[in-house]
Amino acid sequence: MKVRSSVKQICDKCRVIRRKGRVMIICVTPKHKQRQG
């Protein structure tokens, strides 16, 4: 899980979701998991 101020989709499988007011990227590639913070 990478914590970044700006989250971007890295590949086609990356999806942007909002959880508890936080913007997150979920993907089939674990390396692509990101959270805004």
From Swiss-Prot:
A GO cellular-component term linked to this record: cytoplasm
GO molecular function per UniProt: structural constituent of ribosome
Keyword annotations: Ribonucleoprotein, Ribosomal protein
Pfam family, one: Ribosomal_L36
Disulfide bonds: none
GO terms under biological process: translation
NCBIfam families, sorted: rpmJ_bact (TIGR01022)
Family recorded in the similarity comment: Belongs to the bacterial ribosomal protein bL36 family.
Listed name of the protein: Large ribosomal subunit protein bL36
The species this protein was found in: Mycoplasma capricolum subsp. capricolum (strain California kid / ATCC 27343 / NCTC 10154)
